Amino acid sequence: MSFSSDTKNELVKIKDHSAAVCLAELMGAVAFGGKIRREGGTMVLRTVTENPKVARRIYQLMRDAVGITSKIVIKKTSGTTAYYQVCAENEDAITLMISLGFITKPSDMNYFSSFSVNTAYLDKPVKKKAFLRGAFLSCGSVMNPEKKYHMEFAVPTYGLHNDLFSVMTSLSLKPKVVVRKGTMVVYFKSSEDIADILTLMGAYNILMRFHNVKIIKEIRNDANRTANCEMANLRKMVDASVVQVQAIEKLIRLNKFNTLPENLKEVARLRLEYREHTLKELGEMLTPPLGKSGVNHRLRKIQEIADKY
């Protein structure tokens, strides 16, 4: 099961304390997943989802917060995907639309064209959070953080995009928007933003999983950076050692080695014998011991002498 499905499966278990909060969540779910159709003489409001638990949640919200009895219809495509439609018909559909603030009177259905959010229903932060939860259940998704940080809401209309954007910014979120195949996509790529949304929606178990993955990724990235840094330092040390050995061998080849002062010859002999040792390790082998900078100074002096020939 996907990380996104796990998130929705946790959200549908949340128990709200008031009808107003339930209405706010239902408003989000219906606005972003609902469609009005007239089929023969029947008017049907369908809220569509691929998740059966989300369909059950919407059914329960309609029953408990609005007092209507809807039905769940399962539609299967040519493949293995099934769609669950929570259907409210005729008077129940009108009651639902009025209860959620999409229309004010039954006759408004004759002119209804698209959903828009009545912000008067979202006058408190707790209602906005519930609305955000409902919107996510209908049109949201979040990627497994092990792969990448990405959460998005695929919004069906430009007007709803504005509504969702407004609610999000009022909750101090900073969404970004892109148009993908004619659909407005409100998205987040920051791990901090995604964690904030999970918190606002009430997905606390998923939030813990998200943070655990983030911590592991950060530890792994830190380890990789450290390893890369150590490898780079090792390459520098090896490169320097090669140059030093070449300078010493040049002096030996030209019979100039014995002209070096004894302190330089001592370091040169150690470098030839211990080519993979660090400057610090070479210095500890000298009598008396010499610090890293002192060894480096002597080897540079040898290189300068070799460069003259």
Feature roles, as predicted:
Residues 36-44, 146-148, 278-280:
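Short acidic, hydrophobic short linear motifs in intrinsically disordered regions
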Residues 200-297, 302:
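Extended mid-to-C-terminal alpha-helical interaction segments
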Residues 24-32, 130-138, 269:
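Short, hydrophobic/amphipathic alpha-helical patches that form generic packing surfaces
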Residues 47-49, 152-155, 285-290:
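Short helix-coil junctions and helix-kink-helix linkers
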Residues 48, 125, 154, 187, ...:
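Conserved phosphate/pyrophosphate-binding and hydrolysis machinery centered on Walker-type P-loop NTPases
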Residues 304-309:
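Short, Lys/Arg-enriched C-terminal cap helix and immediately downstream tail that follows
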